[in-house]
Amino acid sequence: MQDPNEDTEWNEILRNFGILPPKEEPKDEIEEMVLRLQQEAMVKPYEKMTLAQLKEAEDEFDEEDIKAIEIYREKRLQEWKALKKKQKFGELREISGNQYVNEVTNAEKDLWVVIHLYRSSVPMCLVVNQHLSVLARKFPETKFVKAIVNSCIEHYHDNCLPTIFVYKNGQIEGKFIGIIECGGINLKLEELEWKLSEVGAIQSDLEENPKKGIADMMVSSIRNISIYDSDSSGSDTEAK
């Protein structure tokens, strides 16, 4: 179908006979600016204000505006509360053993809590703390805490460290005990993020396990070794 705004002789004839409407002229920058200013003028002044500014300027509005302001203020307040609730945490906090029950087991309803039991003398624990600090900032809706293991469990063996527990509504929904379960000595941030997302503690945007590629390479290498071993065995048999 032919574009009615296209500059063709046929379209011009149709315009002259009134069959097509006059061609729309492109708006220049000044006209665009005027339109934008007109649209901005239609916005009520209070719609650009913060809650604090609304409080200071409320004497300057008429009765009709005040009613609208109350509705608008309530809307802004609810948006602010929702944002604060979502961004409630945002850091890896240190707690002691006597805070465990209140901070972890009895945390508020439907809240995910990730706790890391650690010792500073265990290098892998320091790696996990570093990764959890990053994840706490990335997922502020989840509570991330750490505690020196001696303050929570006496005589806990170093072989069981790092230990990560994931709680929700007082129940352990996931646990990673020891270096292997936590992801190995070369644990990457994305790998720990994947582990926590698998148990539901965070909503990650990772689409697959970051370690999958490494695992596939290892399987491929093992298969290649097996093939070479088979070829070698066959050659030895023929030689005999």
From Swiss-Prot:
User: What GO terms fall under cellular component here?
Assistant: endoplasmic reticulum
Question: In a knockout, what does one observe?
Answer: Male mice are infertile, show severe defects in spermatogenesis and exhibit lower testis weight, epididymis weight, sperm number and malformed and immotile sperm. Show dramatic abnormalities in acrosome formation and in proper sperm head and tail development.
Q: In which tissues is it expressed?
A: Testis-specific (at protein level).
Quote the subcellular location field of this record.
Endoplasmic reticulum
Main localization is endoplasmic reticulum
- Keywords assigned: Differentiation, Endoplasmic reticulum, Spermatogenesis
Which intervals of the chain are annotated as region Thioredoxin fold?
Answer: 89-240
Which Gene Ontology BP annotations are present? acrosome assembly; flagellated sperm motility; sperm axoneme assembly; sperm flagellum assembly; spermatid development
Q: Which Pfam families match?
A: Phosducin (PF02114)
Q: Which residues form the Phosducin domain?
A: 38-201
Q: How does it assemble?
A: Interacts with the CCT chaperonin complex and actin.
User: To which protein family does this belong?
Assistant: Belongs to the phosducin family.
Q: What does this protein do?
A: Essential for male fertility, spermiogenesis and acrosome formation.
Please state what the protein is called: Phosducin-like protein 2
